[in-house]
Amino acid sequence: MTDVYQHIECRWCHGQSPATSTSCDRCGAPLDIRDSVTEGGWRQAPQIRDLTEIQSGSSVYQLDGTVVPIAEVNLGEGERVFFEHHVMLWKDEHTAMSVMDMPGGAKRILAGMPFVLSVATGPGRVAFSRDAPGEIVMLPIDPGVRLHVREHAMIVASANLGYSFEKVQGLKAMLAAGTGMYLDSFTAGDQPGLLVLHGYGNVFERTLAEGETVQVEPGGFLYKDAAVTFDISTQKLDTGGGQGLQAAKGLASRGFAGLKAARSLMKGGDGLAGVLSSGGLQTAAAALTGPGITLMRLTGPGRVGIQSMYMEHGAA
């Protein structure tokens, strides 16, 4: 039997495993993960079983928990990981700790980003948690690959990954994209690295072909390959409300009492009752008078990762 039949390639991380394996030896993902996709092309991030050992260098990573999961790292001698200090849950007493200065400190402070990162050096164990419901995913990054990630989504990363940030271009994109002023950027050099992210809700991924686009709710964006570009588009809404819509606008201008009447008027007709009942005066007025909804338009080629629970910039 030739070598090609003795191994199977993981479609998630492209690692090679024996043909009889049911999960990837490198990242722990089920080897048939690409067989389970929606008609829209999305697949759920690999459901790595609790306490599955994932090797990166001489360190071992494990995930545990469901509602608020944790990532535990058993660091090899001299191996390091970096992270934001507030996500560390516990560590062995002898695990060495230090800090790593980040370039552009003043800009990062103004943008609400950390200007120093914590570093743990092995040997020893250290565990991390976002202290929020969601899902933790492990993303192997191959040499030469660069990944853009939503601010504050990183849980921990192997120290052989280059970490920087890239400014979101354009005022409209910065204000509307929901990602803040910057995107985190992670790059693998000569050696592969491992990036651990937290997504609110569940995490899904789709691979876009060259020139293929998808429009995403800005709060749902989590990560993308660097080759994937994005801009902001406004989708105009046709309410079909006619005179009823104009009457609702007039009622909404009268304050909360008017909003209640507007809600009754619009209920079942224009789909805005839920907004009126939960969004408050400002949101309701914007919904009634605004030109449309803002979406993040991503264009391939490359991977796009989303989280199913929308989070505004700055939420943690």
Indicate where each model-derived feature is located.
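Composition-driven recognition of glycine/serine/threonine/acidic- and proline-rich low-complexity segments
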Residues: 3, 7, 11-21, 25-316
